[in-house]
Regions:
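A conserved active-site cap/scaffold subdomain adjacent to cofactor or substrate pockets
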Residues: 186-218, 222, 229-230
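Nucleotide/pyrophosphate-binding catalytic subdomain
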Residues: 1-200, 224-225
């Protein structure tokens, strides 16, 4: 799976695009880390919990960077702290306050692909913070906004946005275009395609979003029409 992602990133890079990849932990890893914490205490300290669960993404960014370098793409892995994602101090559910783009711009201008640990940042005291479940979506949208990216692509385990969960309802219809208000409503009603905070962030900063399948290389996904108009 990591090598498949690397090959997809390489295609974009080879076409001359500046690419920032935001990744989450491997499937099941965050739950495994949470279980380890709960084995120690039923009420783990939120600061220590963030310090612990943020390591899942750090493993993934290193693996993807290794994979990219192995196929001839210069890549650099960066944690939320290293990439300059500053948050408040609400451990386990922090909100992004600002992003320093200097480090990213330096690497992008040098022709490198940046692989960023999603779901995490740091507060004013230098503590590691996490953004809550699905926070990697928010990280990706926030970085796209900060860099004024042409588009933010969100890869999921379904090939776009559906009227309902296609894994539960086989007759669910795929939506090619969707307004911001509709996407926000779906997220607020429990749609697992995007984290609601990431949708709010995208609307606020007018980030063009495209939802794509992690398994389908040829699918165009669903595009948020509101964003394209700006």
């Amino acid at each position: 799976r990591i090598l498949n992602v690397a090959r997809r990133v390489k295609r974009w890079h080879d076409h001359g695009h500046k690419v920032v990849v935001v990744v989450s932990a491997m499937s099941g890893e965050t739950n495994r880390l949470l279980a380890l914490a709960k084995a120690i205490t039923e009420t783990p300290d939120p600061r220590e919990l963030d310090q612990m669960v943020s390591t899942g993404e750090q493993v993934t960014i290193s693996m993807l960077s290794m994979a990219l370098n192995s196929i001839g793409v210069a890549a650099k892995s960066l944690t939320g702290r290293q990439v300059g994602i500053k948050t408040d101090s609400a451990f386990t559910k922090a909100r992004i306050e600002s992003i320093d783009t200097d480090v990213m711009t330096e690497h992008l201008d040098a022709g490198r692909v940046i692989v960023v640990a999603g779901f995490q940042g740091f507060d004013a005291d230098g503590n590691t913070t996490t953004l809550g479940r699905g926070g990697s979506d928010t990280s990706g949208v926030a970085l796209a906004a900060a860099l004024k990216a042409d588009e933010c692509q969100i890869y999921t385990d379904v090939d776009g946005v559906y009227t309902t969960d296609p894994r539960v309802a086989p007759k669910a219809k795929k939506v090619d275009r969707i307004s911001f208000e509709e996407m926000l409503e779906m997220a607020s009603l429990g749609s697992k395609v995007l984290q609601i905070r990431s949708v709010e962030f995208a609307g606020k900063y007018q980030v063009p979003l495209r939802v794509l399948s992690s398994f389908d290389n040829d699918n165009d996904g669903a595009f948020d029409e509101d964003f394209k108009q700006n």
